[in-house]
Amino acid sequence: MPQISRYSDEQVEQLLAELLNVLEKHKAPTDLSLMVLGNMVTNLINTSIAPAQRQAIANSFARALQSSINEDKAH
């Protein structure tokens, strides 16, 4: 069952494209990109989520990330 979001596909795609452009502009390798994006997620959780909810949000985010990973062997 598809997820229903309060954000339009256009909003999500535009923000994603802008973030990817920044990483490409800085020629960030995959490991640096993942480190920076992970730090951004941590910062958002720590500064925007109530302390009592942070662990649950982090767990939910981790599950969503794991479920979205493609198991295709192609690299």
Swiss-Prot record:
Question: Can you tell which superkingdom this protein's organism belongs to?
Answer: Bacteria
Q: What are the GO cellular component annotations?
A: cytosol
Disulfide bridge partners, by residue number: none
Q: Which family does it belong to?
A: Belongs to the UPF0352 family.
- This chain belongs to which protein, by name? UPF0352 protein YejL
Native source organism of the sequence: Escherichia coli (strain K12)
Q: Which gene encodes it?
A: yejL
